[in-house]
């Protein structure tokens, strides 16, 4: 609640900024006291509470909040952003900068979204549109054929293009899927491929 009283929004439709980051503070607390793995398991465990009933952002100008998913889905969105940094310290510093930038301010989701795009030096609007303005959770689809892998995003907005960390036979690899098929080839036949569970996405291996 400290976070929400420090930074909040001027429209209840954007209350995910207040509630999502406040929810994620529980993950930060768990990580600090019990370790990174425990923090990851905690935030992943909250996904079972996500309903995907309505978009997180409500209708503007009519005093309407979005879905209650602003808490747990919002927290998982923040955790996903952390993964895109691929550097825990840089993410921590960005969080501190956010608290400086918007200190004791009433702001908007759009301003916060722009802030995180600036911090990552990447247009995150496809990410925010997907998780805040849609009820769909993207699915990473994979097709394996020997030493070749085809991959794409499905069940998502047409412009969704967020990178994801996967493990190919236990080795870390970053993919940059879009909604059209892409492909990569390794020297040897691929046995297993799976996404990092810290990304709140679905996963399907197609035949």
Language-model region placement:
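Short acidic/polar inter-strand loop motif in beta-rich domains
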Residues: 197-207
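Hydrophobic alpha-helical and helix-loop surface patches within well-folded domains
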Residues: 1-156, 171
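Compositionally biased, low-hydrophobicity segments enriched in charged and small polar residues
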Residues: 94-102, 177, 184, 204
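Beta-strand-rich binding/interaction modules
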Residues: 124-125, 140, 144-198
């Amino acid at each position: 609640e400290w976070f929400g009283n420090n930074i909040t929004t001027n429209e209840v439709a954007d209350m995910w900024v207040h509630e999502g980051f406040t929810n994620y503070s529980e993950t930060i607390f768990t990580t600090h006291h019990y370790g990174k793995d425990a923090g990851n398991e905690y935030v992943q465990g909250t996904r079972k509470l996500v309903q995907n009933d309505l978009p997180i952002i409500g209708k503007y100008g009519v005093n309407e909040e979005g879905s209650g998913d602003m808490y747990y889905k919002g927290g998982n969105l923040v955790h996903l952003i952390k993964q895109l940094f691929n550097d825990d310290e840089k993410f921590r510093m960005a969080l501190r900068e956010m608290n400086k930038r918007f200190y004791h301010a009433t702001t908007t989701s759009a301003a916060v979204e722009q802030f995180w795009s600036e911090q990552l030096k990447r247009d995150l609007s496809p990410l925010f549109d997907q998780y805040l303005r849609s009820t769909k959770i993207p699915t990473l689809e994979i097709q394996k054929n020997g030493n070749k892998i085809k991959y794409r995003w499905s069940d998502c907005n047409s412009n969704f293009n967020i990178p994801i960390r996967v493990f190919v036979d236990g080795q870390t690899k970053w993919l940059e899927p879009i909604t059209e098929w892409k492909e990569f080839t390794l020297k040897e036949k691929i046995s297993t491929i799976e996404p990092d569970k810290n990304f709140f996405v679905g996963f399907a291996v197609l035949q």
